Amino acid sequence: MIPRYPSALDDFLFDVRGYLVLEQAADAQLVVDLNQSFDNFPPIKPSGWWGNAQRRDYTVETGFELHNCVEAGEPFERLIDYPGWINYVRHYCGEEKSYVEGLFIDECVASIRRSGGHHPVHSGGYQGALRGRYLYTNGVFRCGQVNIILALGDVGEGDGPTMVIPGSHKANLPNPNHGDYAKGDRMDHLEGAVPVHLKKGDALLFVDGLMHGGSSRTNPHGERRVTIYRYGPLWGVTRYGYEYSQALLDRVTAEQRKILQPVPPNRPSTT
């Protein structure tokens, strides 16, 4: 795939809305290969490990979520610096034009959601964590985390599409109808929230400070399959303490390794 770069219009819309839809961000073969990998996932109980990947569902309603999925096979490794979006995330959260320019993947998830599943709304600019903060200052973007959700099948009405509240990454006040995340409150009818429908191979890019979640999947058949890669500055750490295996670091390209391990360990010589 030819590398894609953000346009001036992309920058404007990202600034105003907090998200972009990258149509056909992934080529057809990658989507096929990822779906085959999903088909081959073994049955993993919650909190169970499969190699260096762990099933860690965000809530009981969110469905099957395999964290550290970059360790789950070669197709997931291709996503690290995929040309359909890598230049976007470098631009928005890679500390462009600074002495710490670069990226780090602090979370990567393979997600399967079936009928009835959803994800409560979370994040938003009000009292938001620095980790997910939106910032544009002195002519550069300085976002704390930018997410890429890649659709491995069409995600339309009733399929449990991601929902967002455009502009909420800049909110200075709390949403009074936010609901209770811990109780699993649904965001389907939250005023201001809109579903983001995707075609197979499309990607949703958004700053983590945007209010977002997953609408209820009402389709009784099939499942919603997506990958979620969260990018941030090179000085970040993985959210849940995962480490990338030495085998993975040795196997990927030099550029990919710089994203997985942008700051190599500094240890004393053993000789």
Feature-to-residue mapping (PLM):
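Non-heme Fe(II)-dependent double-stranded beta-helix
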Residues: 1-16, 23-133
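Double-stranded beta-helix
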Residues: 141-145, 154-213
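Secondary-structure boundary elements
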Residues: 91-102, 138-142, 152-159
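Short, P/G- and charge-enriched loop/turn segments at secondary-structure junctions
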Residues: 131-138, 191-192
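Short, structured patches in soluble enzyme cores that scaffold and shape functional sites
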Residues: 112, 123-125, 146, 150-154, ...
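Extracellular structured ligand-interaction cores
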Residues: 19, 107, 143-147, 159, ...
